[in-house]
Amino acid sequence: MTENNEHLALWGGRFTSGPSPELARLSKSTQFDWRLADDDIAGSRAHARALGRAGLLTADELQRMEDALDTLQRHVDDGSFAPIEDDEDEATALERGLIDIAGDELGGKLRAGRSRNDQIACLIRMWLRRHSRAIAGLLLDLVNALIEQSEKAGRTVMPGRTHMQHAQPVLLAHQLMAHAWPLIRDVQRLIDWDKRINASPYGSGALAGNTLGLDPEAVARELGFSRVTDNSIDGTAARDLVAEFAFVAAMTGVDISRLSEEIIIWNTQEFAFVKLDDGYSTGSSIMPQKKNPDIAELARGKSGRLIGDLTGLLSTLKGLPTAYARDLQEDKEAVFDQVDTLEVLLPAFTGMVKTMHFDGDRLEEEAPTGFALATDIAEWLVKNGVPFRHAHELSGACVKLAEGRGQELWDLTDNDFIETFAAFLPADKAPGVREVLSSHGSVDSRNGKGGTAYGRVREQIADAKAEVEELKLFPASTSDGSAYKAPGTF
């Protein structure tokens, strides 16, 4: 398109001069907010129709306005229209483009009844709602990859750890599902957050509302919102919902980082629990033997970045008075960075998880070591009438005895158990403790709800699958149940 490169500002009538070059450079935001252009054009269409319903645009003017906005959208899509150096923000750039197409008289009418304050507050909500659905879909892909690995793991037992020390044997599937559930909760948080952000600030004006008879409810419906914000000041200035999204993104990063840490450890030569697919690993520029878990390491590193975005945003918001202040321009880069990070990270991370190969023999071999069956001894003693305080001490005595000999618990003799338990159990009963001295026996005994017994793990996998089926509706719909429409399709 032929661009009008003449400087256009959305303010200035009471000023005797334009902004200084230094102020213009500081104020400029098109380098990051241009990504809101599609949402802005969609919002402008809805606003134009509101102006038409209010009698502020004739039917002919409304048609020409919509045609001009369609043309502007095409030019944005094909790259023939873009911001220029003088454009303060994406709203300024798009108004310049609209006036270039529709003319100054018609193009200049679109701003009636709309402030950049309510405009940008609505656009960031639209953008985040759309991308939250994309992120939710990517998270569910990762959950499904963990479920698939859990199903493949079957009855494989591994050493469960607390404080990074051997604790108790658990099913590998149980360990993997322990990472699936937090990710499911991250999706649930996005869905819950969407209920609150599903309100349009359009019609709030600068802060006090509008006097032109516009219909904010109609605009809200056209833009995929189920309602309008209840307070015009809150509508223009509230960024708690942006911060809430930033928290969910940061929490997602933390949940992924914790899984990354385990994968990195499991992938070491010392552990050798898992091998990563070549397609999801990297090498060294100098050491030919290296096969590095870069995706897991990058995920761990990027979690700090996601947390930093949240912290920076909260620091910006904490000192602001009520109503709009220019500081709020700083809300966007934080969440833009988070979305960009997650939308690149999650597909790579899911691919790594999906293609991991676990060494079942190695896991089974390590599962009962490190005196991991000591708790089973204590619980066996309790079942045989020994108070737990004493059972705990007796099990600890068995550990001390085995450790002193450089043995494992199952290496102790019947006489060892008879002598250790003599004050509480008859000699003929003490050797019966051997029935719990196997990792599979230990796992199978933990069959309460949420436990690591095979049947319970199968149960939780089924529950997770059902939850995913319900949650996957979110990426394809708005919170009010209607089909979510991408910008430009209203």
From Swiss-Prot:
EC number of the protein? 4.3.2.1
State if Membrane is listed as a keyword.
no
PROSITE patterns assigned: FUMARATE_LYASES
- UniProt GO cellular component terms: cytosol
Q: State any GO BP term from the record.
A: arginine biosynthetic process via ornithine
NCBIfam families listed in its UniProt record: argH
Q: Which HAMAP family match?
A: Arg_succ_lyase
Q: What is this protein called?
A: Argininosuccinate lyase
